[in-house]
């Protein structure tokens, strides 16, 4: 998948791919859920029956996150997928081109007319596909009717896809965040079309877990508010190998932490994996994070958590 990083690189893309006709969709794509995949599949169907290539135009960060940048991270809207995971999920859908637009003051104040002129106008679009709730431009003033008029003038086929529903409810990022806040990972999986997971690089920590008998892989997290917090039973993917373990996402109040971290104790695993990217799939919640009076109390609780996690993981197999 070819990535276009911002409007400033659009001219370079056109120099290289100006002859390519494009089937295009636009959105934020946080989580890349089943509703998003329905649109992408429709794009691919058109692409397979023509010579056109597929392109997803997406914004980062989410608008709600942008408008709360002055708040503490923990008070900002929760993000389903970090930037890297979003990109990888799009790549897994075999999209030809991804056009990344940074949601900043310039984009936020851009009128719908200028958005069409600067973002869509330079592209050789044959088909434009949007969801039924898509809005664009300053104050979300741009809508389907505006795109319809422009598309007609350019000879572009415009499609508005109907709502994609599961159990008579519209699939949305809001619903997914709701399931994650409840640790309802089975419903999350149904809405995403895949298990919920994080992927990140293992970095050096303070080795506290090792000192109390439970060594952890500390995974770097972007500075975003995460939709889940607490202690969980998890599955871990390292290269082509699969493992089981227990994970904590939180600020580690017992040792005076203030920023969110992801720590994973991998069962029956002793290799050094610093610098490796690993994937952590969340199976079931064990408990909320809490502050303990002593490290000894923390150690005893982790031992209980490990037993609970092993039971949960065994139940999940049956």
Regions found by a protein language model. Give the residues of each.
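Positively charged, low-complexity intrinsically disordered leader regions
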Residues: 1-25
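Surface-exposed amphipathic alpha-helices with a cationic face
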Residues: 40-48, 148, 152
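Glycine-rich, Lys/Arg-enriched anion-binding loops that position phosphate/diphosphate groups
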Residues: 151-250
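N-terminal Rossmann-like or analogous alpha/beta NTP/dinucleotide-binding catalytic cores
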Residues: 65-132, 136-154
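Di-metal (Zn2+ and/or Mg2+/Mn2+) metal-binding site signature of metallo-dependent hydrolases
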Residues: 25-43
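ATP-dependent adenylation/pyrophosphate-handling site
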Residues: 19, 23-26, 43-70
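Residue-level signal for inorganic ion chemistry
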Residues: 33, 90, 128, 188, ...
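Phosphate/ribose-recognition catalytic cores of enzymes acting on nucleotide-derived substrates
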Residues: 205-318
């Amino acid at each position: 998948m070819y990535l276009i990083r911002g409007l400033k690189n659009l001219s370079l893309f056109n120099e290289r791919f100006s002859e390519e006709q494009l089937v295009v969709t636009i959105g934020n794509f946080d989580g890349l859920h089943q509703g998003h995949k329905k649109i992408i599949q429709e794009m691919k169907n058109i692409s397979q029956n023509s010579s056109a290539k597929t392109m997803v135009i997406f914004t980062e960060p989410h608008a709600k996150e942008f408008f709360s940048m002055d708040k503490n991270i923990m008070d900002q809207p929760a993000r389903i997928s970090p930037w890297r995971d979003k990109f990888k999920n799009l790549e897994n859908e075999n999209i030809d081109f991804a056009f990344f637009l940074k949601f900043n003051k310039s984009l936020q104040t851009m009128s719908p007319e200028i958005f069409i002129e600067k973002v869509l106008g330079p592209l050789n679009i044959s088909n434009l596909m949007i969801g039924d709730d898509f809005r664009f431009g300053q104050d979300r003033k741009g809508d389907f009717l505006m795109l319809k008029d422009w598309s007609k003038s350019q000879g572009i086929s415009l499609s508005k896809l109907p709502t994609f529903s599961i159990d008579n409810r519209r699939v949305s990022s809001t619903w997914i965040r709701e399931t994650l806040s409840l640790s309802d990972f089975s419903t999350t999986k149904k809405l995403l079309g895949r298990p919920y997971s994080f992927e990140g690089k293992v970095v050096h920590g303070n080795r506290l877990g090792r000192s109390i008998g439970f060594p952890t892989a500390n995974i770097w997290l972007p500075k975003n508010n995460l939709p889940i917090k607490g202690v969980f039973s998890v599955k871990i993917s390292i290269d082509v190998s699969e493992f089981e373990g227990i994970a904590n996402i939180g600020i580690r109040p017992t040792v005076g932490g203030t920023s969110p971290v992801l720590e994973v104790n991998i069962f029956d695993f002793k290799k050094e994996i610093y610098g490796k990217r690993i994937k952590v799939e969340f199976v079931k919640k064990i408990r909320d994070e809490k502050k303990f009076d002593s490290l000894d109390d923390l150690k005893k609780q982790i031992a209980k958590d490990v037993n609970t996690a092993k039971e949960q993981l065994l139940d999940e197999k049956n």
